[in-house]
């Protein structure tokens, strides 16, 4: 084995020279230079400074403007809530530990940080699954004239939390475990060891199949069918140009969210899968640190995409920030065709 395994950690560094110490008790400066830990801390500070206000603003603006409280927006707000969990439960912890060069909060703090990071990522993934299914059902209409209403949105939100907890909670109760990863300043699922005492191998397989592969299959199937249906409807001119434009803009926004999710999380999932399937292989701490910290940027991109691509929300946000006045006028609101409301596109 090219790393050093302890009772509740795995350091990707051989202890042949005797320098490896517990990441819960000693600085890990033998893994990387102190300035590299400082860079991680600066990065986490940036995510906190950007992630909190933009996600909080998303929630606040929706509460202030009743017209934004549409069923589809419930799912988008669910993403903002999950991102705030990551900011407060994970980012603040990682900022502090990076400044100290090791995970100063011990195994309990590691469990909490790993739980919030996993929970936030899984809520985002399953929210995208619900959005994909909503787009598929509404646009492709496999169930006749189905309308995505408030009750469906609430059930969708509940579903995302149940599935996310089904992934994030087991390591807290003995099925797998959370351990420091990479440079030992943030925590995640143990992909590094088989650890039969906690049935780690079965959990990692379960996680990759149920909480990554299946969601990806559902998302790609739904959008594959959706693209085909929209093209057919446009070719047959079954709906007005305004309706088609609105559907395309909403669908485009959700697809971009999926692409952004893949960009942030696929590198982390790929590296984790490689480490798990190549037990004992030689890799350095940076190998896992970079994709792990890059994935944390997911807390920022969803609200940014939503604000940039939804004129109605953007106008409401400007009105809120300007104390009820819109310096751009009301034309943008009336002209907006990108409202996230129930689709009326007919089946092909």
Curated annotation (Swiss-Prot):
<feature type="glycosylation site" description="N-linked (GlcNAc...) asparagine">
    <location>
        <position position="15"/>
    </location>
</feature>
<feature type="modified residue" description="Phosphoserine">
    <location>
        <position position="338"/>
    </location>
</feature>
<keyword id="KW-0479">Metal-binding</keyword>
<feature type="transmembrane region" description="Helical; Name=6">
    <location>
        <begin position="253"/>
        <end position="274"/>
    </location>
</feature>
<feature type="transmembrane region" description="Helical; Name=4">
    <location>
        <begin position="153"/>
        <end position="173"/>
    </location>
</feature>
<dbReference type="InterPro" id="IPR019477">
    <property type="entry name" value="Rhodopsin_N"/>
</dbReference>
<dbReference type="InterPro" id="IPR050125">
    <property type="entry name" value="GPCR_opsins"/>
</dbReference>
<feature type="modified residue" description="Phosphothreonine">
    <location>
        <position position="340"/>
    </location>
</feature>
<keyword id="KW-0449">Lipoprotein</keyword>
<feature type="topological domain" description="Extracellular">
    <location>
        <begin position="174"/>
        <end position="202"/>
    </location>
</feature>
<feature type="transmembrane region" description="Helical; Name=7">
    <location>
        <begin position="287"/>
        <end position="308"/>
    </location>
</feature>
<keyword id="KW-0675">Receptor</keyword>
<keyword id="KW-0157">Chromophore</keyword>
<feature type="short sequence motif" description="'Ionic lock' involved in activated form stabilization">
    <location>
        <begin position="134"/>
        <end position="136"/>
    </location>
</feature>
<dbReference type="GO" id="GO:0046872">
    <property type="term" value="F:metal ion binding"/>
</dbReference>
<keyword id="KW-0564">Palmitate</keyword>
<dbReference type="InterPro" id="IPR027430">
    <property type="entry name" value="Retinal_BS"/>
</dbReference>
<feature type="transmembrane region" description="Helical; Name=2">
    <location>
        <begin position="74"/>
        <end position="96"/>
    </location>
</feature>
<feature type="modified residue" description="Phosphothreonine">
    <location>
        <position position="342"/>
    </location>
</feature>
<keyword id="KW-1015">Disulfide bond</keyword>
<feature type="modified residue" description="N6-(retinylidene)lysine">
    <location>
        <position position="296"/>
    </location>
</feature>
<feature type="transmembrane region" description="Helical; Name=1">
    <location>
        <begin position="37"/>
        <end position="61"/>
    </location>
</feature>
<feature type="modified residue" description="N-acetylmethionine">
    <location>
        <position position="1"/>
    </location>
</feature>
<keyword id="KW-0007">Acetylation</keyword>
<feature type="glycosylation site" description="N-linked (GlcNAc...) asparagine">
    <location>
        <position position="2"/>
    </location>
</feature>
<keyword id="KW-0297">G-protein coupled receptor</keyword>
<feature type="topological domain" description="Cytoplasmic">
    <location>
        <begin position="225"/>
        <end position="252"/>
    </location>
</feature>
<comment type="similarity">
    <text>Belongs to the G-protein coupled receptor 1 family. Opsin subfamily.</text>
</comment>
<keyword id="KW-0844">Vision</keyword>
<dbReference type="InterPro" id="IPR001760">
    <property type="entry name" value="Opsin"/>
</dbReference>
<dbReference type="GO" id="GO:0016056">
    <property type="term" value="P:G protein-coupled opsin signaling pathway"/>
</dbReference>
<dbReference type="InterPro" id="IPR000732">
    <property type="entry name" value="Rhodopsin"/>
</dbReference>
<keyword id="KW-0716">Sensory transduction</keyword>
<feature type="disulfide bond">
    <location>
        <begin position="110"/>
        <end position="187"/>
    </location>
</feature>
<dbReference type="Pfam" id="PF10413">
    <property type="entry name" value="Rhodopsin_N"/>
</dbReference>
<keyword id="KW-0600">Photoreceptor protein</keyword>
<feature type="topological domain" description="Cytoplasmic">
    <location>
        <begin position="309"/>
        <end position="348"/>
    </location>
</feature>
<dbReference type="GO" id="GO:0097381">
    <property type="term" value="C:photoreceptor disc membrane"/>
</dbReference>
<keyword id="KW-0472">Membrane</keyword>
<feature type="topological domain" description="Extracellular">
    <location>
        <begin position="275"/>
        <end position="286"/>
    </location>
</feature>
<keyword id="KW-0862">Zinc</keyword>
<feature type="site" description="Plays an important role in the conformation switch to the active conformation">
    <location>
        <position position="113"/>
    </location>
</feature>
């Amino acid at each position: 084995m090219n790393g050093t395994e302890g009772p509740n950690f795995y350091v990707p560094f051989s202890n042949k020279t005797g320098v490896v110490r517990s990441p819960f008790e000693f600085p890990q400066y033998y893994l990387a230079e102190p300035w590299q830990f400082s860079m991680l801390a600066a990065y986490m500070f940036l995510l906190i400074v950007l992630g909190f206000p933009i996600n909080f603003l998303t929630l606040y603006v929706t509460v202030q403007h009743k017209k934004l409280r549409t069923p589809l927006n419930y799912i988008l707000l669910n993403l903002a809530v999950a991102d705030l969990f990551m900011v407060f439960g994970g980012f603040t912890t990682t900022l502090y530990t990076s400044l100290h060069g090791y995970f100063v909060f011990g195994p309990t703090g590691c469990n909490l940080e790993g739980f919030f990071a996993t929970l936030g990522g899984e809520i985002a993934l399953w929210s995208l699954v619900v959005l994909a299914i909503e787009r598929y059902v509404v646009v492709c209409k496999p169930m006749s004239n189905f309308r995505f209403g408030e009750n469906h949105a609430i059930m969708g939100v509940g579903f995302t939390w149940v599935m996310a907890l089904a992934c994030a909670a087991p390591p807290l109760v003995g099925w797998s475990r959370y351990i420091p990863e990479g440079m030992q300043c943030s925590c995640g699922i143990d992909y590094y060891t088989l650890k039969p005492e906690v049935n780690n191998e079965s959990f990692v397989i379960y996680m990759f199949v149920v909480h990554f592969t299946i969601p990806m299959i559902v998302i790609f199937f739904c959008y594959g069918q959706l693209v085909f249906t929209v093209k057919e409807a446009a070719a047959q001119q079954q709906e007005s140009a305004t309706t088609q434009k609105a559907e395309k803009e909403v669908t485009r926004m959700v697809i971009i969210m999926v692409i952004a999710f893949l960009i942030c999380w696929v590198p982390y999932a790929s590296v984790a899968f490689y480490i798990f399937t190549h037990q004992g292989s030689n890799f350095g701490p940076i190998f896992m640190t970079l994709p792990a910290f890059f994935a944390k940027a997911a807390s920022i991109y969803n609200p940014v995409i939503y604000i940039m691509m939804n004129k109605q929300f953007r106008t409401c946000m400007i009105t809120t920030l300007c104390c009820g006045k819109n310096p751009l006028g009301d034309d943008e609101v009336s002209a907006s065709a990108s409202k996230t409301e129930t689709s009326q596109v007919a089946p092909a």
